[in-house]
């Protein structure tokens, strides 16, 4: 995204930056001259086609997730509604990054008069990406809270997490994240905004980690207590723990894919002139690729961890021209 993160493309300053596709800032140039491996300070080039391709793949995958959850009534549960919210956020992040690649290409090829309009479009895209990032974090936290309730408040769960209440929670998440994302971009020239975003990221991770430490420490004891009750409490608790493990994988992938970007922000505000920090920040395009990969990996995790969702995926795909492949696979 367009920012002054040591190698920004635009003269306007924003904290989210898409680099200059092979060029670098004056500050980076001066740092590179003083070191024998000055090439480290060259902004890593990634072909625009890569961003567009990843955006299209993410779009198709996450639309499949959303349609599957809407189609299958067995998936109409709080956890899957929150997963649907996460899928929307993932889709917007990747599609917006892909769209921004096109905007940047236009910005480089248009005249000065048209560039101001293109920059405004890019600012809108930045706001969408920032809002989607916040929505992703909040959706993951919501899934963690939902798993916590299913394990420790199993008997009261359906009274606590009603469909109406879940709908209100998701609506509030997106409303708050949209407003926050817009404000972050408007005031992105301020270092305080970057610090606020970094703080939110690590605070949410700390909250989720706290929930999981408590969940996995107490889960076995709680399962034993539920097991003495009539019905299928043990089976239900086993399914709930499977959902908790799925979320653990999702959070792990999220951290791996987003951590380099937030480390980039930390370096930007703490050591922008340090040669090692500049070298790390020169790989910003790679960190954007990781972010887009997160949006592609998440639907694969859903499919691998949920037999019901996997079954629905197959039903949807078989309704289209690819149905012949489904018939062929069912014969062998």
Curated annotation (Swiss-Prot):
Know the name of this protein?
Melanocortin receptor 4
Which parts of the chain does the record assign to the membrane side Cytoplasmic?
A: 70-81, 146-165, 216-248, 305-332
Q: Where does Ca(2+) bind?
A: 100, 122, 126
Protein task: Hormone receptor that acts as a key component of the leptin-melanocortin pathway at the intersection of homeostatic maintenance of energetic state. Plays a role in regulating food intake: activation by a stimulating hormone such as anorexigenic alpha-melanocyte stimulating hormone (alpha-MSH) inhibits appetite, whereas binding to a natural antagonist like Agouti-related protein/AGRP promotes appetite. G-protein-coupled receptor that activates conventional Galphas signaling leading to induction of anorexogenic signaling in the hypothalamus to result in negative energy balance.
Which positions, given as ranges, span the membrane?
A: 44-69, 82-106, 124-145, 166-186, 192-215, 249-271, 281-304
Provide the assembly information: Homodimer; disulfide-linked, also forms higher order oligomers. Interacts with GNAS. Interacts with ATRNL1. Interacts with MGRN1; this interaction competes with GNAS-binding and thus inhibits agonist-induced cAMP production. Interacts with MRAP and MRAP2; these associated factors increase ligand-sensitivity and generation of cAMP.
State which ranges are Extracellular (membrane side): 1-43, 107-123, 187-191, 272-280
Organism lineage reads as: Eukaryota, Metazoa, Chordata, Craniata, Vertebrata
Where located? Cell membrane
Glycosylation sites per record: 2, 17, 26
Fetch the CDD domains from UniProt.
7tmA_MC4R
State the source organism's domain of life: Eukaryota
